Amino acid sequence: MTTRQQTKRLPPALGPLDNPLKGWAAYWFSWLTHYYQPVSMNFWYVSWRELEPNPQDYQFAQWAQSWDKTQPDTRENHGVFRVYLDYPSQPTGVPQWLIDQGVEMRPYSDYGGGLSPDYDDPRLVQALTRFIQALGAYFNNRPRVAFVQLGFLGFWGEWHTWPRTELFASDATQRTVVDEMRAAFPNKILQARTANGYLGVHPWLGYHDDMFPEDTDGGEA
């Protein structure tokens, strides 16, 4: 008895075979005009500064509307997003009004340089807590949002300032962000960059690797 291998190609369809919300989520940068591979889930960075240019003046609707305007070939895709305060080599993501209140911005030269805010300043923590609550009120029940990454703290919102470890947030501030995000997004799957410390004790928290499969946390290709 002989068998013959057959290849069955399944066309795109709305149904169980889609394996929804699984696979690769492509990055989107301002200099791109289209994706080079077909995707059905996008990843977006956005700064706190863009979303709250003035105290409690939230630009969530405007930002969400821009998803399809800037990316017409991915219209209605599911999305994953992360809010950052500090993206090395880019302008600060901390709102100017918060800087004007006196929150210290500490310069560094690693990864192209930037300004790392004092994550433990009570003014920043209070404003960030209020922002997270508003962010959840807007996005928690929107089905287009597949996952939300914790973000906010550290370089790229990745929860580290290596090798400038003295710039990172205290354990208390880390706990505040995790707890507030969980409370604000009860209907979304949240993701963290690592399982270090308080991030590693929650069964409801998932993890993401930005550079997989280019490299891993251990540096192997």
Task: Label every model-predicted segment.
Residues 6-30, 40, 147-154, 163-221:
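Catalytic-core regions of glycoside hydrolase
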Residues 55-60, 161-164, 197:
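Generic preference for flexible, low-structure residues
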Residues 56-67, 125-134, 168-180:
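Well-ordered, non-membrane alpha-helical segments in soluble/globular domains
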Residues 69-77, 131-145, 176-190:
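A structural motif corresponding to the C-terminal end of an alpha-helix
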